[in-house]
Amino acid sequence: MQIDILSLFPEMFAGPLHESMIGNAIENDVINVDVTNFRDFTTDKHNHVDDYPYGGGAGMLLQPQPIFDALASVQEKHPAPGRVILLDPAGVQFNQHVAEDFAQEEHLTFICGHYEGYDERIRSLVTDEVSLGDYVLTGGELGAMVMIDATVRLLPGVLGNSESAPGDSFSSGLLEYPQYTRPADFRGMKVPDILLSGDHGKIDDWRLEQALKRTYERRPDMLTGLSLSGKAKQMLADIKADESEV
């Protein structure tokens, strides 16, 4: 996968793109990442990328010309079809399903904004407008890092265990079940006996029940419209009954 990032602050990506999972993905040629400073595409001697909004108002807006030209340069170097993603508070909220959708693409380009916002004509370039959440950040760089991380870890060959990504919270539609490692007894806090039993069928049932319980208690909104097996539906009904008795 080719990932391009348009940003006024390319140095912000130096650390995150060369560490841990993403660093390994680059080293193993699973992905290639290029960061382009769209200030390099300005045409005035002061390298301005922003200007005052027509009609008045607070703040400065990113001008269309530098971003149009920067994107054209990126697409000339990497003509593979793909998505152009505008980081914007008014966009669709990013979640695991969006990450899974992005992971199917050959080429992703992230446009990271700054200042008050974008000249509206910039939106004509993009295929997706995406927000990290209902809060305001100084720029789109941190949001792009999160989206890239969530997307890249889904690509084949990135995670050491091929079962890791499908078992993560949100991938199944449920929060992840509790997990334990050695020692089996730490300061009186013991690993549940079922996990030490070696009975994989019972362990799977326990994990499903715990995932349902955790989701019901912490994120009940995730259960709305979720397709559950007959066994899971009965488990959830029992969990709700137990909760109502407390």
From Swiss-Prot:
Main EC class the enzyme belongs to: transferase
Transmembrane segment boundaries: none
GO cellular component: cytosol
EC number: 2.1.1.228
Sorted UniProt keywords: Cytoplasm, Methyltransferase, S-adenosyl-L-methionine, Transferase, tRNA processing
Biological-process GO terms, alphabetical: tRNA N1-guanine methylation
Position of the signal peptide: none
Binding site for S-adenosyl-L-methionine: G113, L132, G133, D134, Y135, V136, L137
Compartments in which it is found: Cytoplasm
Catalytic activity as recorded in UniProt: guanosine(37) in tRNA + S-adenosyl-L-methionine = N(1)-methylguanosine(37) in tRNA + S-adenosyl-L-homocysteine + H(+)
Pfam (any one): tRNA_m1G_MT
Principal location: cytoplasm
GO terms, molecular function: tRNA (guanine(37)-N1)-methyltransferase activity
Biological role stated in the UniProt entry: Specifically methylates guanosine-37 in various tRNAs.
Family stated for the protein in its record: Belongs to the RNA methyltransferase TrmD family.
The protein's assembly and partners: Homodimer.
The protein's name in its UniProt record: tRNA (guanine-N(1)-)-methyltransferase
Protein species of origin: Lactiplantibacillus plantarum (strain ATCC BAA-793 / NCIMB 8826 / WCFS1) (Lactobacillus plantarum)
